Amino acid sequence: RDMKKFLNEVIYIIKDFPKEQRYVVGDRIESTAIDSLHIIARVYMGKDLNMRIADMVELQSNLELLNTLIEIAGEHQWIKGRGKLANLLLLMDSIGRQSTAWKGSLIEALKRSESERSQC
């Protein structure tokens, strides 16, 4: 849900980027956010724990890239208004925490599954 909020915010904020950055940094932010939503859906619907964990690693990599690009955009004042930047950073923090917890629960489920298999 927070990722969807983040994407909605980004779509409007990118419009205010300088033209030369809108099509470089802005497009990268938007496409990475969309890719991240796709990864979340893939993890949610996936069955193979190893694959889901690998997808979570990919998601966390995307989130790190998004966070860095948002910080750069903020430093260059391409994001108009401190409140908008702060909101994006808060959403990124929340998404990061959720993904870390989700990945941790998947790793625990994998350990339990492997433990059950070794006991058989």
Model feature map: region roles:
Residues 1-120:
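Amphipathic alpha-helical assembly/interaction segments
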